Amino acid sequence: MIRVSGPDALAVADKVIVFRHGSCAAAQGYTLKYGTVEGVDDVLVSVFRAPHSYTGEDSVEISCHASPFIVERLMQLLTEAGAVPAEPGEFTRRAFANGKMDLSQAEAVADLIASSNEASHHAAIHQLRGGISTELQRLRSQLVDITSLMELELDFSEEEVEFADRNQLISLLDSALSHIRKLTDSFRLGNAIRRGVPVAIVGAANTGKSTLLNALLGEDRAIVSPVAGTTRDTVEEIFNIDGTAFRLIDTAGIRDTSDSVESIGIERTFEKLLLADSVIAVFDVNSPVEKLCSEFRSILSRVNLKSQQLIIVLNKADLLEGFEEARPSFASGTLSEDENASNRATLAVNKIVTEFNKIVSLTDNEVDTILLSAKSGFNLEILSQALSSHQKARIADAGTATLVTNARHFNALSTASRALSLARSGLLSHTPTDLVSQDIREALYHLGTITGEVSTEEVLGNIFRKFCIGK
């Protein structure tokens, strides 16, 4: 489909296409017209009249066969008739300029096109339909009311009239700050949905982290070797589970090393661990319990169990003595202590689980422990479901609340929050009203940059150049 938009769009179409009945220029909006481009193709043209079109301008959308030659020839003929090739995002930029959508909704168009799963699609649709815009309208309305009261007071300063009690203004600012905090707090989840939930796969060297990544992806993405320290940098891949994208991050094995390159990789492991929403801690179930406990304490000290999901994976189950005999009992899901265990594999696993539970109990939290074999695929599905269930619970907790998914919006909200905090401090310290009012106006400015009520050519250029041509 080729789109032409602008005041001369219908006239340009008439120069290129011979219609069976009448012309584009004489057609009403929301009309389909059949026509022929001589020697090129038969086409179907959708006619839209301003302001009832995507861009808010007169527009035509020409549906033709998808042959590269046909498309190229049509583009050439349209250009010769007076049209100009569109820049990336130009149609959406015109829609924004003509008031068909605000800037946050325009950005949602790009997110919608880029969405690769149900969760990111839902978030983009919510924003496109005005989710964040509605929240910001409420916020700006609150702040405008506060500013109006303060500036009215300034107009009557010589008469010493107080239009708003300071405690009342502080209460109003607290309400606005709380509103902004809810939005900024949603960014971690919103950004994860948009870009893929970050899942760090961490553990000591040679525990099978890269094999686990490859098994989850169903392809050999990371290099697997029996030599410890093979993975020296992070490897990231998107993995979809039940309509949600997860960004799996394979990391360098944690160990003491004199290799400077490997040391940098290990530092990056710790960085990714801090930023992950979920952490898969991988252990070789065949290692001595004391060694495993030491590795576990090291990882646990870097995980925030209040905000991060931790899944313990006891890998290489297929190498356990007596594994095949105990396999049915291990396939039931996450592990717990079994006081009646007699099988060697069960006893070995039970000992590890007991010691790990003692360590976890000191944190007043619970974690999932899964015995699996990344090599054979045993219990891989249980790991996938543990990730999926946790993410679904987070989304359910958010309910119908608006999620901030865009880093630009998050930064603007954070800056507005800082300005309002200064205004609040000013009211508490009896700072002159005009200075406090200036802080609130600054907050309004930054909120306005999100929807485009305040914008610069540089900001608009940065946003729309990321679009594909045709949108």
Where are these regions (language model features)?
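Generic enzyme active-site microenvironment
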Residues: 248, 282, 313
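A glycine-rich (often HGG/GG-containing) alpha/beta subdomain
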Residues: 1-122, 126, 130, 303-306, ...
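Terminal RNA-binding accessory module
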Residues: 213, 237-238, 244-247, 270, ...
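Inter-motif core of Ras-like GTPase G domains
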Residues: 264-286
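Conserved nucleotide-binding/hydrolysis micro-motifs of P-loop NTPases
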Residues: 6-9, 50-53, 67-69, 101-102, ...
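Short, conserved glycine- and acidic-residue-centered signature motifs
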Residues: 262-265, 436
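Switch I (G2) and immediately adjacent beta-strands of P-loop GTPase domains
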Residues: 36-39, 45-48, 230-257
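C-terminal-of-GTPase-core extension/linker across diverse P-loop GTPases
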Residues: 121-240, 257, 275, 286-471
